[in-house]
Structure formats: structure tokens, C-alpha cells
């Protein structure tokens, strides 16, 4: 039952719009209990600035979950190193940001929480604090000891997963191997089944090169790597179409049949999805032993505390996590 489920939320960079969005989430009822890992004073201060009602209660492990009521939040406390001014980064709070991610992740791994929804973090501030950090996806993979996870962004109409994520373009081709494709496509296929309720997922796969290599005249990765990998996976019963040129694949005649698209690199697939659904897209990490969704935007420091931040993507991420919980329990 959803009413017996808890999800954990991290508000992200404290100087950004994450705390604003969490306060906005609290203004409506939810069918699950929302537990926010954050500094309680940060949430109180931001609610006061936004002039929105907010009652906080401290999270008590071992108690029964209660569906969320408008105007209230359950808080799993973490404490800032320095006071926060909305819109002003302070690298001293970077350890606080990572502490919230670690505690939320550990709670999901232990079964304490049914899903994790993350607000936007500021990668630059964390790295400026001397902490190597490339993103949520890699952080959770390392903490959960997963050798491979897959980044996927989704709207209501389109899901795009990535064979590679945060790599310089010059390193992409060398990272596309048969082993990589086997692992990525297997995770994508299995999570479409278990977390999205797709019994026989149909995955469309982009080529790496222009025109998918043009028969080897514009690169041989399709011939030497991608096609053999797809053929091997088809022999396992997977329904795969491709490799197709990306400028051909992202058309309605193909997308209407696709449960997901696999792009070879970050900027091959995500610009199309974000153009189609920015503000409504959700970032999902596949391959983790728990459900993780996230907003599709950044910290928007200039909007923090202004009341102008749009909680649409956060609400969509939370709603998708709830839907995935349902599918996982069926």
C-alpha cells in the first residue's frame, strides 16, 4: 500500500532553489510520507521568505509511515556548516550537501525508504571545496557499489537513456564497447520491465557516427561494435531496433513504437528530450537497487528565495517515483 511507504527527498544546494521547491511540494497532500533530508532551519527560513505555511516534524525511524498532509513535512535533520543566503554559494556547505545524499542513499539501501528524489546540486561548488564530484549518478553508484548504472531522462512521451554520461566528446568512441553496450542495454531492459511495467520493452538504439557510420565510410563503430552487440542481445530475446542515425530515429514514426531510446552520448539524446519537455522531464538512475529520480534543471541561484521557481519538474519526479513504486510492487 502506498500509504505505508516513505520516500526520501534531498533539497540539494542550500543556496539554490531546491529548498524553495521542497517547501512548495509541502503545500499539497501526497499519498506517501515525504522525508526531507535537510537542515530544518533552512526549510523554516525559506518558507518564511516565501510566505508559505510549513510545520516540521522530526523523522522517527521505526514508526509507521503516514501519508503527507499539506503544510507539513517530516525532516531527517542534517546541519549546515555556515548560514545560507539565498542565491549566494558557500563552498563550506558542500560537505552538508554530500551528507544529505549519503544519508538518503543509505536509507534506501537499508529499505528504510522506498525511493529517493533529489533536488539540484551545484557541482562547481562541491569541486571548489576540494571534493571530486561529477554528479548524483556516479555518487550513488559508488555508494551502492554498483559497477554500472544508467542515466535516463524521461517525459510522458519519451525516455532517453545514455550509453555514456559525463565524458568529454573525444573520449566517447573509446568508451563504446560491446561490454558497455551489453551492460547498459541489459540494465535498461530489466528496469523497463521491473520499474516501468513494460513486459517486453522495445528499445531503439542510436548509432554513434553521422548517418550511423554510412556503411563504414563515416566511422566503423557501428559495424565493429554496436551491430554485433545488438545481435548478441537479440539472441537473448531482447527487442532492439538499430543502430539508426539519431536525426532519423527522433521522429514520430519511430518514437511511437519505442519504450526507450538509447543514445550513445550525453548531447546526442538529451537536447531533443529537453527541447520537447523541459520543466517536465525527470532524471532517473537505472541499475541501482532502489528507485532514484531527480529534477531536470540546475540550482537557478538567481531565483532562490524569489517565489518564482517552478516546482513542476520536482513534482513530476516525485509522481514518477510513486508510479515506479507501484510498478515494483505489482
UniProtKB/Swiss-Prot annotation:
Its main location: cytoplasm. Keywords: Cobalt, Cytoplasm, Magnesium, Metal-binding, NAD, NADP, Oxidoreductase, Pyridoxine biosynthesis, Zinc. It comes from Erwinia tasmaniensis (strain DSM 17950 / CFBP 7177 / CIP 109463 / NCPPB 4357 / Et1/99). Binds 1 divalent metal cation per subunit. Can use ions such as Zn(2+), Mg(2+) or Co(2+). This is 4-hydroxythreonine-4-phosphate dehydrogenase. The active site is located at the dimer interface. It is found in: Cytoplasm. Pathway: Cofactor biosynthesis; pyridoxine 5'-phosphate biosynthesis; pyridoxine 5'-phosphate from D-erythrose 4-phosphate: step 4/5.
Amino acid at each position: 500500500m502506498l500509504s505505508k511507504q516513505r520516500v526520501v527527498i534531498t533539497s540539494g544546494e542550500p543556496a539554490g532553489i531546491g529548498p524553495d521547491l521542497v517547501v512548495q511540494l509541502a503545500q499539497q497532500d501526497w499519498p506517501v510520507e515525504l522525508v526531507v533530508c535537510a537542515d530544518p532551519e533552512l526549510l523554516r527560513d525559506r518558507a518564511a521568505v516565501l510566505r508559505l505555511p510549513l510545520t516540521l516534524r522530526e523523522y522517527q525511524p521505526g514508526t509507521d509511515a503516514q501519508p503527507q498532509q499539506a503544510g507539513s513535512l517530516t525532516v531527517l535533520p542534517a546541519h549546515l556548516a555556515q548560514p545560507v543566503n539565498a542565491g549566494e554559494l558557500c563552498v563550506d556547505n558542500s560537505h552538508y550537501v554530500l551528507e544529505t545524499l549519503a544519508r538518503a542513499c543509505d536509507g534506501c539501501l537499508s529499505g528504510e525508504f522506498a525511493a529517493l528524489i533529489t533536488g539540484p546540486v551545484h557541482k562547481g561548488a562541491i569541486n571548489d571545496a576540494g571534493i571530486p564530484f561529477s554528479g548524483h549518478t556516479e555518487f550513488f553508484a559508488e555508494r551502492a557499489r554498483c559497477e554500472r548504472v544508467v542515466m535516463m531522462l524521461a517525459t510522458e512521451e519519451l525516455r532517453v537513456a545514455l550509453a555514456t554520461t559525463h565524458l568529454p566528446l573525444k573520449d566517447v568512441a573509446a568508451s563504446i564497447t560491446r561490454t558497455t553496450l551489453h551492460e547498459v542495454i541489459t540494465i535498461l531492459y530489466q528496469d523497463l520491465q521491473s520499474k516501468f511495467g513494460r513486459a517486453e520493452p522495445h528499445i531503439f538504439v542510436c548509432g554513434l557516427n553521422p548517418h550511423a557510420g554510412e556503411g563504414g565510410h563515416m566511422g566503423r563503430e557501428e559495424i565493429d561494435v554496436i551491430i554485433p552487440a545488438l545481435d548478441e542481445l537479440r539472441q537473448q530475446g531482447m527487442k532492439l531496433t538499430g543502430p539508426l542515425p539519431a536525426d532519423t530515429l527522433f521522429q514520430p514514426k519511430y518514437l511511437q513504437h519505442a519504450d526507450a531510446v538509447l543514445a550513445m552520448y550525453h548531447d546526442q539524446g538529451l537536447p531533443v528530450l529537453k527541447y520537447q519537455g523541459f520543466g517536465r522531464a525527470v532524471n532517473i538512475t537505472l541499475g541501482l537497487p532502489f528507485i532514484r529520480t531527480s529534477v531536470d534543471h540546475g540550482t537557478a541561484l538567481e531565483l532562490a528565495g524569489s517565489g518564482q521557481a517552478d516546482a513542476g519538474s520536482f513534482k513530476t519526479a516525485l509522481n514518477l517515483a510513486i508510479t515506479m513504486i507501484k510498478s515494483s510492487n505489482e
